[in-house]
Regions:
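Acidic/polar, glycine-anchored loop/turn motif associated with catalytic or activation segments
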Residues: 1-88, 94-139
Length: 139
């Protein structure tokens, strides 16, 4: 499988690698690929590497990008409704009977989220516990 990371705001390894201040809003969402291989530490690769290694064709890479950016639009909107910024997320794609498919989950656990108002980093499990506690106390 090909791991895909979509970033909206600079954070984590992106900030460290490129010297961009954490929290910098990117001019447009970026996409990064990594070769899903635990023994190698899932190294970053580019489109050419993916094609050369037989991980994806040019057309499949375009399909993956289209799907990844569409997922980004949906997740950004969904999390914004919960007062959360979608900083970045990772998903994996692979082939099944010749078709490009999502090969892993899309979940809050694969997303980096910050509070819209405070930029506080949100750990989704803790956030959900707090949310449920607040809503249970309203009854």
């Amino acid at each position: 499988p090909l791991e895909v990371i979509v970033r909206n705001i600079a954070a984590g390894s992106f900030s460290k690698r490129l010297g961009v201040a954490e929290g910098t809003i990117l001019a447009e969402p970026t996409i990064e690929f990594s070769y899903k291989n635990d023994a190698l530490g899932d190294p970053f690769i580019n489109d050419s590497y993916a094609k050369a290694l037989g991980l994806a064709t040019e057309q499949e890479i375009e399909t993956i990008k289209k799907y990844a950016f569409k997922v980004n639009e949906v997740l950004k909107s969904m999390f914004l409704n919960a007062n959360l910024k979608l900083i970045d997320f990772k998903i994996e794609f692979g082939r099944f009977h010749g078709d490009i498919i999502l090969a892993d989950e899309i979940s809050p656990d694969t997303c980096r989220l910050w509070d819209v108002n405070t930029n506080e980093k949100k750990h989704i499990k803790k956030y959900l516990e707090e949310f449920l506690e607040r809503n249970n106390n309203k009854e």
